[in-house]
Amino acid sequence: MAQFYSAKSNKTKHLSQKISLTPTALDHQGQAVAEHQGKVVFVPGLLPGESAQVQLVENKARFARAKVLKRTSDHPQRIAPPCPHFARCGGCQLQFAPTGLQRDLKQQALAQVVSKLSGLTPEQWAEPLLGPDWHYRRRARLGCRYDAGELVLGFRQEGSNRLTAIDHCPVLAEPLSELITPLQQLLAPLKLARHVGHLDLMLASEGPVVVVRLLRPLREEEREALAAFGQSRGVQMLIQGDALTDLSGQAVAPLHYDIGEGRPQPAFLPGDFFQVNGVVNQAMISQAIEWLQPQPGEKGLDLFCGGGNFTLALAGQSAEIIGVEGVPAMVERARARAAELGLEQLRFEYADLNGEAPKAQWLKDVDWVLLDPARAGAPGVMEWLAKLRPSRILYVACNPASLGRDGKVLAQQGYRLSRLGLVDMFPHTHHLESMALFEPGNNKHPK
């Protein structure tokens, strides 16, 4: 009888394999990086220098992934995670390392990935931008599940849709963390508990805000219960159904958030993007002003400007600043806010920044550019951006791999990486943000 090769059984055999590893670094996603038989293996939950027995969970031609079965040696700085939910909650990945060690490892990962993908080394490393280690997050989404007569509020488990029930969160701003248990107690007895999709919690200048994602219309007794809760706790309660409304069914007025030093506050609505770490965001804005050094008479572009986080702060620094955003509603909100504040030197324009260069007059004679793209970076922007020949390009990156790829394009167009700095926006997580300043000059062009 013929015997046929089974790729599936071979793969299963390899995935059951147990091996011993000692990683040498963390990558930019917070995974330990080790080598086994010439192949790179990524292992969450380990620190460089620790030894562990692991099991492969994915085995590709060029790399593998593994899970820890047992640590056989610990890093001298390893600590017990302070949060009791850490082992199950997917929100944090690095609580077993002190924040100082986390930052050192993140900076090493940032340097490695930028150098690898762009061929660039910064002329100057900036000091990391830091904020509080705990209670820094001013926005979060709580998942809701009604199961066996019980309402569960919590965060998703790592790599899963399952919820981990929590009663507090040490990285969430205290006014928001303190609402978790009372919200569970408020909603659980109500019939609407079965119809809540999630809760969005945010801390605005106006105070705490809770948005209830409701999958059916709100009933009068439920409205009264939510209103009483909001009034007693100083919380603005909103409903997200087919539209975002207050409890009376009216449209919601824009909220605001502080960007420090008496600067004009951007306006936003729940659902808009804004930086979740207020202290570090203010530090980023101050560093942007310091690095760009906008001068009277200059013209600047703020690409991917959102509601004007940087644009409003830069108001008055240059003769003309143009914020460019691809979400029409946010453009309209930013325009209205600038008009409300009387900031005539600011303009906000809509443009699809993932495609060809906009054919617009405002692209001419640009002196400096700030861009703050999403994790995918700005591949559609880099070629035409470099052709504008601004004297300073400040790239705010939430993904170092995108920064490295986009930085390579700038390098090929004759820009050098003059400054690079870590931005520790999310302590205890694998998220790694950075700021990079590119200026014209001699540079080793990547091949």
Curated annotation (Swiss-Prot):
Query: Which Gene Ontology terms cover its molecular function?
Result: 4 iron, 4 sulfur cluster binding; iron ion binding; RNA binding; rRNA (uridine-C5-)-methyltransferase activity
CDD domains given in the database record: AdoMet_MTases
Keywords associated with the record: 4Fe-4S, Iron, Iron-sulfur, Metal-binding, Methyltransferase, rRNA processing, S-adenosyl-L-methionine, Transferase
Q: Which domain of life is it from?
A: Bacteria
The residue ranges of the TRAM domain are 12-70
The entry marks the following residues as binding [4Fe-4S] cluster, namely 83, 89, 92, 169
Query: Tell me, what's a Pfam family for it?
Result: TRAM
Q: Where do the catalytic residues lie?
A: 398
Similarity remark: Belongs to the class I-like SAM-binding methyltransferase superfamily. RNA M5U methyltransferase family. RlmD subfamily.
Family annotation (NCBIfam families): PRK13168.1 (NF009639)
Q: What is this protein called?
A: 23S rRNA (uracil(1939)-C(5))-methyltransferase RlmD
Q: Which organism encodes this protein?
A: Ferrimonas balearica (strain DSM 9799 / CCM 4581 / KCTC 23876 / PAT)
